[in-house]
Amino acid sequence: MASSVWQTELPDLPEPKRGKVRDMYDLGDAYLMVATDRLSAFDVIMPDPIPDKGKVLTQISLFWFDVMKDIVDNHVLTAKVDEFPVKCRQYADILEGRSILVKKVQPQAIECVVRGYISGSGWSSYKKSQSVCGISLPEGLKESEKLPKTLFTPSTKAELGEHDENISFEKAAEIVGPETAEKLRDLSLAIYTKGADLANEKGIIIADTKFEFGTTDDGRIILIDEVLTPDSSRFWPKDQYEPGRAQDSFDKQFVRDYLLEIKFNKQPPGPKLPQEVLDKTRDKYLQALKLLAGDAYSI
């Protein structure tokens, strides 16, 4: 079985800031971003890592960062461990394939969510109010149906363990400023459209996703964090797509479904996950990487 990394311990580096999945090391003039194999569902970190998950997330993100270069710059400096600062290279066996040296930027204060299909919380909202995040939709939509128009539905950025809160575009404009909000919306829709079209050709429907952006010292908005991964997006197999029901997926929806089945209360600590759930989730992540990126970004 593949080895897994629950959290990184790199003694010669500063103490990292740990998020749900990533450990961020402040190296002074750059960050070392390491994707662990932690998995969170319903904003709760599960106690069992998914082997190789962090590597898959990193390689998929690197693939998309490259694909999207003509739309927006990104924060990647290098993903080659032998180009990292010398003090990092001793940890090559841990860092290889799951880490990126990234530029320091000021993160934007909102999450940029894009929805191309109606699913998850969007579907729940539609059933109650025929709207998603305050945006009215036509009646008669089925679960998992392609939306008449791709939606930009921003949210607040919650602290670890808290829930992101959906907000209107107007509220987003209040938080980041009208001009920046428009720029974030336009970039998000452009990236999603290009990504969804390319993924569709490779047999994956990207139902929805979440982007993060940052601002450089010279005022440019760039793409940061992760891009169109099974953690930040809903990936559905195109050959099994059937509107009117919840879809099979390449992402952690498999874990979410299991947690709903056991009536998990969505409060920490997360429950132990059965080996079968861990294995199947790992397989789904690997399958998504292979379909999207082929062998160029294999782990």
Curated annotation (Swiss-Prot):
One GO CC term, this protein: cytoplasm
Reaction equation(s) it catalyzes: 5-amino-1-(5-phospho-D-ribosyl)imidazole-4-carboxylate + L-aspartate + ATP = (2S)-2-[5-amino-1-(5-phospho-beta-D-ribosyl)imidazole-4-carboxamido]succinate + ADP + phosphate + 2 H(+)
Pathway noted in the entry: Purine metabolism; IMP biosynthesis via de novo pathway; 5-amino-1-(5-phospho-D-ribosyl)imidazole-4-carboxamide from 5-amino-1-(5-phospho-D-ribosyl)imidazole-4-carboxylate: step 1/2
EC number per UniProt: 6.3.2.6
Keywords from the named record: ATP-binding, Ligase, Nucleotide-binding, Purine biosynthesis
Principal EC category: ligase
InterPro entries, sorted: SAICAR_synt/ADE2_N, SAICAR_synth, SAICAR_synthetase_CS
The keyword Ligase is assigned to this record: yes
Gene3D superfamilies tied to this protein: ATP-grasp fold, B domain, Phosphorylase Kinase, domain 1
Alphabetical list of PROSITE patterns matching this protein: SAICAR_SYNTHETASE_2 (PS01058)
HAMAP family: SAICAR_synth
Protein name, entry field: Phosphoribosylaminoimidazole-succinocarboxamide synthase
Species: Desulfatibacillum aliphaticivorans
